[in-house]
Amino acid sequence: DVLPMAGEYVAAVLQEGIAKFVEGTQPAGVDTSTVVDTVARISGYKAKAAELLGEPVPPRPPGFCVGCPERPVFSAMKLVEQETGPFHVSADIGCHTFSTLPPFNMGNTVLGYGLGLASSTGVGPNFGNRVVSIMGDGGFWHNGLTTGVANAIFNKDDSVLMIFNNGYTSATGAQHIPSTGTNARLEPTGQDIVSALKGVGVKWIKRVRTYHVSEMRKVLGDAMTTKEGGLKVIIADGECMLAVQRKKKPVDRKAVADGDRVVRSRFGVDEACCTGDHSCVRLSGCPSLTIKSSGDPLKSDPVAHVDEGCVACGLCGENAHAATLCPSFYRADVVQNPTAFDRMVERWRRRYISWLG
């Protein structure tokens, strides 16, 4: 019994398990002291940190990555719930399973990979409104198209299916799937989700960019309230942010090194405008959107703050607009290797600001 039967196999758990295994087996001719000493040293660091902090380090709950394209969809779903009332959400296996945790708490059932729609068909008749099923593009090709969509059409199911089209099986390492566009050998493929849906008889299909929260809110609201029966499918398009960053960062680094103009966007919060009610935090759950002291003795509540991990996905601003929150978010563009025109514009901006006093 060197590893726990339940829980996540994080590095610390694996280190302790390996140390127990090595200690218990004592392989001949192998010095096991290094492994045991390493684990003991790390445990000592943790104990020392807890002592200095005065309290245990707070747990880090699992959640969506910074800039994840799936987070905005659940922000939109929370806004739709305010209009239609609570509805059953049949969750699925994938990154989107994190929606079952705070701050969204959306996902009443999780049956299996690609089985979100199949499970909702069984419970749907027990509710007074339409149920929403969640499915990733990986789950769609794995099981969802046949077990879920085809059977929903066959059984005249009147519900809503949300398909996250992020381009990969992201939760397990961004493996290619039929709709990625290429296979593992980077050979072009001709399969796409819309054609597959139409092929099994789906009539109501909408596509929305995931980061467009207001548009997603409207389309999902229409799907929940339309008098048209049958399965209604919303394809939420947004490439996995980890994949985007893996491609973008090397290109930007090379461009900067070559002396080319590179613009990097960042979002922030105007502390003077922030009201301190933190609705923006509760509506997005972005790890980069946190709080800090206002520094104003007349404003006791902490204000929202965007930290250095921001990838400029724009969700904070989209949520503020869609939910009519305070207008405290702003976007700033950081220009590396600016041109002569950039420098001239910046000089005029500074001069104009000084004139305003």
Q: What are the residue ranges of the model-derived segments?
A:
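Charge-patterned, long linear interaction tracts outside catalytic cores
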Residues: 36-78, 242-258, 262-286, 307-314
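Intrinsic disorder at enzyme termini
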Residues: 258-270, 322-357
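Flexible loop/turn segments at secondary-structure boundaries
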Residues: 64, 72-73, 96-100, 139-143, ...
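Peripheral docking tails and interdomain loops at the edges
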Residues: 1-61, 204, 213, 217-220, ...
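Active-site diphosphate/adenylate-binding microenvironment
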Residues: 31-116, 126
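Iron-sulfur cluster-binding cysteine motifs and their immediate structural context
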Residues: 13, 238-239, 244-245, 250-251, ...
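Hydrophobic alpha-helical scaffolding
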Residues: 1-8, 58, 63-70, 106-113, ...
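Thiamine diphosphate
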Residues: 100-233, 241-246
